């Protein structure tokens, strides 16, 4: 009888050991799994960050994949010049050369078919080149804060000669600059520093926000993107609302949400390159009338940083990790993401009682 009991005890002890081992392994596996939620208003650079993860932590974009972006590059280029030409009418800006009016008519006549077919024919690229060189068009481009224009407009239009070549294959940088509105949730997986990342990019336009909700559970960290350069712009979906104010409103609701009490919040103040360019001629008082500092990058950027960090109502227990970023600069994103990962590792160890 004694032997039987001890054999059963032994088996039970083995089972218990196995369960403990499995639980420990599951715990370690869970600690290595990182769920990152990318949040922010529309056009703040979230999708560009996702593309950078593909370049930095995966194999980037193959030639075949880059080829597939040709139609998007063409569409972004055509849409940009059309937006500028349309705005000339609203802003009452004339072409410097009156014959450009014919080119404008040609642009609207040719663009629809070109976009549908995903091509940039010679006659259309010639029309775009002549329009972009016109001083009136350039004057209108200089006033782009008064209408909706893609950030990548000048990047593509200045490089039209290369883009219009018949054998054109987009570069990684061309791909990074493409703009396609994110609808729904885009999930990306990659491994870095022994951690398995699941990154969720969520559409930033207001109509998309209700889809975020079920992504929130069990999130390790939130990366909140803000377009620094949007301080003098209004929303595409609400012409009354300043984009920076909208961003602050959204950040406030995320940062102080009861669901995220234990979630690391990482703030990416993005598009620092565009902000640095813009701040010298477009004052920060457009967005913050109370601002009395200089319209210089360092001072103005610090002011915006403090405006966001001051929204944190739990400063004693919750830290905001802020980084200034340029999402189209791979080296910058690589450096910043390295620092972000260290914060995540440190916080994970804290949660496990190992730090």
UniProtKB/Swiss-Prot annotation:
Tissue distribution: Ubiquitously expressed. Most abundant in the lung and in the spleen.
Topological relation to the membrane, as annotated: Lipid-anchor
Keywords, in A-Z order: Cell cycle, Cell division, Cell membrane, Cytoplasm, Cytoskeleton, GTP-binding, Lipoprotein, Magnesium, Membrane, Metal-binding, Myristate, Nucleotide-binding, Palmitate, Transducer
Pfam families (alphabetical): G-alpha
Region of interest (G3 motif), residue spans: 197-206
A single cellular component GO annotation: centrosome
Residue numbers spanned by region G5 motif: 325-330
Claim: Ligase is one of the keywords in the record: no
Region entry G4 motif, spans: 266-273
Residue positions of covalent lipid attachment, annotated as N-myristoyl glycine: 2
Residue ranges, annotated region (G1 motif): 35-48
InterPro entries for this protein: Gprotein_alpha_I, Gprotein_alpha_su, GproteinA_insert, P-loop_NTPase
Described purpose of this protein according to its UniProt entry: Guanine nucleotide-binding proteins (G proteins) are involved as modulators or transducers in various transmembrane signaling systems. The G(i) proteins are involved in hormonal regulation of adenylate cyclase: they inhibit the cyclase in response to beta-adrenergic stimuli. May play a role in cell division.
Protein name listed in UniProt: Guanine nucleotide-binding protein G(i) subunit alpha-2
Originating organism: Macaca fascicularis
């Amino acid at each position: 009888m004694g032997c039987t009991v001890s054999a059963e005890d032994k088996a039970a002890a083995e089972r218990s050991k196995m369960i403990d081992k499995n639980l420990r392994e599951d715990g370690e596996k869970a600690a290595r799994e990182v769920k990152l939620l990318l949040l922010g208003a529309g056009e703040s650079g979230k999708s560009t960050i996702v593309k950078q993860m593909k370049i930095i932590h995966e194999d980037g974009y193959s030639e075949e994949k880059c080829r597939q972006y040709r139609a998007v590059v063409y569409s972004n280029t055509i849409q940009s010049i059309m937006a500028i030409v349309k705005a000339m009418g609203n802003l009452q800006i004339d072409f410097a050369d009156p014959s450009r009016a014919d080119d404008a008519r040609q642009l609207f006549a040719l663009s629809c078919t070109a976009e549908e077919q995903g091509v940039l024919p010679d006659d259309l690229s010639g029309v775009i080149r002549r329009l972009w060189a016109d001083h009136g068009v350039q004057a209108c481009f200089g006033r782009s804060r008064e209408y909706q224009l893609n950030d990548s407009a000048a990047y593509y239009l200045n490089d039209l000669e290369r883009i219009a070549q018949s054998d054109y294959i987009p570069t990684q940088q061309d791909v990074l600059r493409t703009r396609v509105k994110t609808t729904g949730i885009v999930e990306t997986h990659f491994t870095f520093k022994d951690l398995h990342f699941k990154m969720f990019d969520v559409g930033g336009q207001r109509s998309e926000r209700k889809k975020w909700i079920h992504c929130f559970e069990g999130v390790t960290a939130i990366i909140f993107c803000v377009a620094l350069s949007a301080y003098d712009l209004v929303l595409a979906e609400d012409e009354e609302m300043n984009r920076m104010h909208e961003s602050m409103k959204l950040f406030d609701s995320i940062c102080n949400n009861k669901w995220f009490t234990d979630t690391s919040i990482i703030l990416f103040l993005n598009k620092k390159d565009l902000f640095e360019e813009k701040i010298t001629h477009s004052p920060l008082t457009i967005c913050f009338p109370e601002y009395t500092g200089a319209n210089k990058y360092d001072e103005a950027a610090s002011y915006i940083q403090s405006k966001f960090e001051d929204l944190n109502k739990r400063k004693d227990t919750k830290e905001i990790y802020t980084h200034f970023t340029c999402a189209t600069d791979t080296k910058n994103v690589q450096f910043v993401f390295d620092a972000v990962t260290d914060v995540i590792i440190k916080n994970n160890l804290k949660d496990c009682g190992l730090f």
